[in-house]
Amino acid sequence: MPSSSTDVDAIRNFCIIAHIDHGKSTLADRLLEVTGTLQHNQMTAQVLDDMDLERERGITIKSHAIQMHHKAGDGRAYILNLIDTPGHVDFSYEVSRSLAACEGALLVVDATQGVEAQTIANLYLAVEAGLEIIPVINKIDLPSADVEGVAQQIIDLIGVDREEIVEVSAKAGIGIDSLLDAVISRVPAPADHRSMPLRALIFDSVFDAYRGAVVYLRIVDGVLRKGDRVRFFANDKIFVADEIGTMGLKRQPNTVLEAGNVGYLICSIKDVKDAKVGDTVTLADNSAKERLSGYKDVKPMVFSGLYPVDSDEFEDLRESLEKLSLNDASLVYTPETSAALGFGFRCGFLGLLHMEIIQERLEREYKVNIITTVPNVEYRVLRTNGETILVDNPSKMPEAGLISEVEEPYVRIQIITMADYIGNVMKLSMERRGEYKNTDYLDTLRVNLHFEFPLAEIVFDFHDKLKSVSKGYASMDYEYIGYRRSDLVKLDVLLNGEPVDALSTVVHRSKAYEWGRKLCQKLKTIIPKQMYEVAIQAAIGSRVISRETISAIRKNVLAKCYGGDISRKRKLLEKQKEGKKRMKQVGRVEVPQEAFLAVLNIDE
């Protein structure tokens, strides 16, 4: 049934929002199966999670969209466009883009876990976008399910009536039909704006090696026809719509996309930067006056250097990053050089999970071996001459004498945990310079703790540590609140007096000594012994605050002296000592890749 002839009031655009592991992708699979979009023998777990990485980690990284046809109880045929969204804190911008393309949202909560931090964060995004929210309790068939307790949490959270909550088990296929009925009856149909000038919202784009950029969009106003000349608001470029259509499991070409529908557009976009996610598409000849609202250029929060292990692979790394950046509007990168690592790129990421995923995708999909430097945030530095600069690389931090003050980004964080672990979470937060704000009790067992943190303290391994101090129960979500002044210092690592720029970090003065000591000890275990002594020093400016020494490998030069005069032995030892001294002057210490990663897991 071609979507071109469909009545707008038979279309339902909705998405699924949930915390990680609450069964969102499995629920999407079940909906596809029940509506006949997928036959049972075509099923792979998590159909919409295309990347192996998504299936392996059990997370959704990209936004996906798929069209389903469903005959409701009233005998009418409906078109359901499901837009699957990521659930992790790093991808909240992807979530907001997908939400803007919908009219309704299924809020999925695990019956065994209850409401978690990410559930609340995504719920706020959905409420801001003005979506109709259908609460769904999933995994009701598990023995440990507490359906009534979780229902009460949802009622307290969004104020719905108990009978409005749909109970399902995505795995067992229970309650899916009643969920589809709820989508049809409760999610509003799109507004009928077919007569207005074309405005379409890009919520995702992927790169096809043969066709260029494939743009996924929601038609908000007007009609898009095959062969139309279209204009992108962000860069004012004009393209011809070579192919348009809707998305089933595969792309289904069509000749018309009307207001209210979701589809794709292929128009020979060669440069990946031209298809900006969040941009508005209009017709070149009958243009809309204003772009669609609510879109911002996404700002990276965490920065890290990516360098090829083999310097010959620099161009491969550049190409791979270019292709990745089309699929991922939030990846930012600029070339940089390092004395220790050669040529590479300074990359900006949304958060730590985003960084890990980009690294894994580079290694898996693009077969590039990379070394990563310590992740850090962007500091705002006021120099003594009154100039303000942004520093995203510790080695670019000016000398201490030239700095009048340093500001770092802060985030507001909410941590939901069992009441038993409040003490552990508080202790961890205080160690990380967190400022406690207040506590909300969700029920008798679970609390929502509010803190303000320097972003630098949580980009490292805070999430892992939080999970371990709460035995896996705590979940967190954060939002950026701005820059604040801090007493920060640049900590350099010197090997035999030579600074290694890739190991520099910016730390709070109160933690500098402890960090320097741990780092030197860690590097001592990783850097292999040389033919000469190697001094590892941590220094703030010219003041060394910690030192470890790797002793030299020594050949036994006295082995062939059987007995004999002591002065002969002394002469041989002195000669060896001179040789080592000369070596030390000309020798360069090879720093293995693990040393750059050591900084990431310094406590282990």
From Swiss-Prot:
GO CC, alphabetical: plasma membrane
List the keywords (alphabetical).
Cell inner membrane, Cell membrane, GTP-binding, Hydrolase, Membrane, Nucleotide-binding, Protein biosynthesis
For the ligand (GTP), the binding residues are: D21, H22, G23, K24, S25, T26, N138, K139, I140, D141
Task: List the InterPro entries.
Answer: EF-4 (IPR006297), EFG_III/V (IPR035647), EFG_V-like (IPR000640), EFTu-like_2 (IPR004161), LepA_C_sf (IPR038363), LepA_CTD (IPR013842), LepA_IV (IPR035654), P-loop_NTPase (IPR027417)
Q: Which Gene3D superfamilies match?
A: 3.30.70.240, Elongation factor 4, C-terminal domain, Elongation Factor G (Translational Gtpase), domain 3, P-loop containing nucleotide triphosphate hydrolases, Translation factors
EC number assigned by the record: 3.6.5.n1
What Pfam families does UniProt report for this protein, alphabetically?
Answer: EFG_C, GTP_EFTU, GTP_EFTU_D2, LepA_C
Q: How does it sit in the membrane?
A: Peripheral membrane protein
Source taxon at top rank = Bacteria
Q: Which SUPFAM superfamilies match?
A: EF-G C-terminal domain-like (SSF54980), P-loop containing nucleoside triphosphate hydrolases (SSF52540)
GO terms, molecular function: GTP binding; GTPase activity; ribosome binding; translation elongation factor activity
Reactions listed under catalytic activity = GTP + H2O = GDP + phosphate + H(+)
Subcellular compartments: Cell inner membrane
Domain tr-type G residues, every copy: 9-191
Its main localization is membrane
Gene Ontology biological process: positive regulation of translation
Role description: Required for accurate and efficient protein synthesis under certain stress conditions. May act as a fidelity factor of the translation reaction, by catalyzing a one-codon backward translocation of tRNAs on improperly translocated ribosomes. Back-translocation proceeds from a post-translocation (POST) complex to a pre-translocation (PRE) complex, thus giving elongation factor G a second chance to translocate the tRNAs correctly. Binds to ribosomes in a GTP-dependent manner.
Q: Which family does it belong to?
A: Belongs to the TRAFAC class translation factor GTPase superfamily. Classic translation factor GTPase family. LepA subfamily.
Alphabetical list of HAMAP family matching this protein: LepA
Q: Which NCBIfam families match?
A: lepA, small_GTP
For this entry, the protein name equals Elongation factor 4
Q: Which organism is it from?
A: Prosthecochloris aestuarii (strain DSM 271 / SK 413)
**Name of the gene encoding the protein in the UniProt record:** lepA
